[in-house]
């Protein structure tokens, strides 16, 4: 921030007047996955919502409030759902042990895991199996986001809004685009995520 102030002494005064971020980031609470640092964004460039395992749950009023504000007030053009390899929430959902109150939160992932269990268990390498389910969870959350009434209404109104699924490698610092992007109602119907039964 010292460098920023040396280049623009009024940076924070300008920043305090308004925010016009072009994107909403929905990511994991993991302290090693900070949105701004991962994408090289400055303060004011990203609206952020984080929770364990980057979940989009239709009864989560916190997430829905963030989504509504970012889409309808800030008019973001992109929403990125970014999970990460090695996600503890996803790993807990794949197991049988109780981890406390979080069991209620990861129930949604656990249900998805049961649905895909046969396919997942065909992957013999444990790390590859875990990584694949992390990716599937992100795709599920992208679909969950795309079918919210907030996003559906924005598209119906002709608002430019794209939803993307990314995964971050803790051990590499690299982001992988999972090639799941929705821009319209038709994108949902035509997507392999929807056809795989992630709905």
Q: Where are the regions that the model predicts?
A:
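Divalent-metal-activated hydrolytic enzyme cores
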Residues: 1-21, 53-77, 88-199
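N-terminal short beta-loop-beta anion/metal-coordinating cradle
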Residues: 4-45
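Gly/Ser/Thr-rich loops at beta-strand to alpha-helix junctions
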Residues: 30-32, 84-89
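Glycine/charged-rich beta-loop-alpha catalytic/anionic-binding loops adjacent to active sites
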Residues: 43-54
